[in-house]
Amino acid sequence: MSFVLPLTASTENQTQNPALFIFLGASNLARSFHGLKYCIERCIFPRPASFVHAMGPGRGYVSRGGILNAVYSPILNCGILEAVRNKKIKDQSVVALITDIGNDIMYGVSSEKIINGLQYLLNSLGEFKTNIFITSIPVDLENDISELHFHIIRQIYFPKSPVKYSQASNNIKAINKFILQSSNKKITAIDDMKQFCGIDKIHYSILKSQSAWCHIAEKLTTSLSTNVSPKFKTSELVFSIANNAARILLTDMLGIIKKTKETF
């Protein structure tokens, strides 16, 4: 009996340690960020959670990108890694999500440069003993999108992009190969997000968005020894979309409202 109490107390203390979540992505993440945050907070309650994020429509990891006059610095150069070094506290668990990879391809960045950037990011996050989750690019151009479909999407989302169909296809294959090969005990590759994509094959379908983020939230929280099933409420999805639109307009475009300390 004398050995049971210390073990139980130790386990309880471990599960009550604060957790820091690092979210990196583009439009999919930005559109559902607040709902994902609330979903995770419920799953790990009463464990304290804090969040930092770098996201935005059209955002790249190694290249500047954005939408209209909302232009974002590359995620690798936005200062979030330095902030985590200063923000992390003793015994804090760190969980990182790297998602929405692919915009850099359409900005003409080579697969080699993108892979080098991702490797640097993985190495840097590894310094914090981070549980890292990284989603592959959920599209295979040759099997999922015709060349005509590709040109239509490029004209809508990346009208100035010179990238050709074959070039994008080869880059996606190279990057996804790197992501899958990077998987280890601390890095989990999430390679099954295609099922949630909408007609453009880039963004998650509005009808499947909640399921997509519940799927990801379950992986993130399971790494913290949590067995509560994530629930992403419809009201939270609506709020997330509205909040994202307001942030893009009032903060990123007009600069009326300042960014929070958690935003990079």
Question: Language-model features: where?
Answer:
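A short, charged/proline- and glycine-enriched loop
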Residues: 14-20
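Conserved SGNH/GDSL esterase-like catalytic core that processes O-acyl groups on lipids
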Residues: 20-113
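A structural signal for short, well-ordered beta-strand segments and their strand-loop junctions
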Residues: 22-23, 97-98, 129-136, 186-192
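Active-site segments of SGNH/GDSL-like serine hydrolases
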Residues: 98-106, 124-169
